[in-house]
Amino acid sequence: MGSQGLATLDTPPNTDSDTNSDVKAGGLSVRRLTLTDFRCYHHQRMDLDARPVVLTGANGAGKTNLLEGLSFLVPGRGLRRARLADMMRRERGEDIDVPPSQVRPWGVAATLGSPDGEVEIGTAYEKAANGNRDKRIVKVDGEVAKSQAVLADHVSVLWLTPLMDRLFVEGPGARRRFLDGLVFGSDPAHAGRVKAYDHALRERMRLLRDGSKDLGWLASLEDTMATRGVAVAAARLDVTRRLGVQLAADTGAFPGAAIEVAGPVESWLGDGPALAAEDRFRAVLAGARGSDAAEGRTTIGPHKSELMVRHLGNGQAAALCSTGEQKALLIALVLGSARMRAQERGCAPMLLLDEIAAHLDSHRLDALFDEIIGLGAQVWMTGTDSSLFKPLAGRAQFFNVAEATVTAVL
């Protein structure tokens, strides 16, 4: 991508004094957002203040694409978990898979305001040469960062999308990813531990399938799984304990909830120190080589742990609750996580709530709006019906999205 790609990261300094005076204490906000060749946007710039943001428009207009761009201000794969190349803007009728020579760089750049001042963040897609993996590049205040992990030092974002509405009824993998996202917001190093564990998990299984006799290499991989796996489980337990305090209170519109993560490794941590849990995990892995090889999978570890959520009002597991109750529980989880981060970091995270008004009655929607305002966070909300957001008149900034063009509603 070279200099062309890096250019998409740069945001002109925000010198408008009237947009710097209203950053709420405790809130992180986007003051300027620029998307370049990202999804449906050729070049889109938005100038904002610290208030919540409401984006309305028809389905397919580009609302969720804006939220996805914002989700790349933090480390990771964004709210859609898409390939980097998939976010390249395509001309009308252009195929998803384009020749490498026709791949266009994309970029997302933002000026962020916080209690600590302003910071310029940019991230872009770099097409790899010579068959290497494509990658994201990141700039902070004009300096190229060594890795995207540095973004966690400056930005905290939580999101809720319609695809997450089935979180409690789908397989446990989605719930583990959701939980790991919450952990990562408090402990950026968690992502590295999960990655190291997953790599060792795959390598061990490859050796077992191949019938490898390299016992030393197997033991080394199992040691990595034990140390990293126990650390992953401990971090998950810590966050669920702290989040449980936030979720215990029933706020009226959104139910109180109990949350825990369960599995053998978590149980071992409850029985004694982490080193003892590591030793036990290491021994179990060594003893299970034959059975794991026969089954073609590793049957124990934090990759099998389960996030369990219970509705405190009716005592039911989230999976047994009605669709409306599950939606309310999910919103309660996200709001509780936002409160926890605000208290612990002294700065409320940004929230990205896609189609949040869908399937919420007026009572819960009004309560959500009040919670958002009380949190002091810049919350980005999308919807097709602008009338649902009327209670936020004067308390939020409104934009219309149509055919990949964003227009302020005055």
Protein language model features and the residues they cover:
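Hydrophobic "anchor" residues on beta-strands that sit immediately upstream
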Residues: 32, 137, 157, 350-351
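Walker B catalytic acidic pair
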Residues: 354-356
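Nucleotide-state sensing region of NTPase/ATPase domains
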Residues: 75-174, 180-190, 241-248, 277, ...
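Conserved lysine of the Walker
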Residues: 63
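Conserved NTPase motor "head" modules and their coupling/switch loops across ABC/AAA+ ATPases, GTPases
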Residues: 1-58, 72, 93-97, 217-227, ...
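H-loop/switch region of ABC-family ATPase nucleotide-binding domains
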Residues: 382-384
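An accessory alpha-helical subdomain
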Residues: 164-253, 262-265
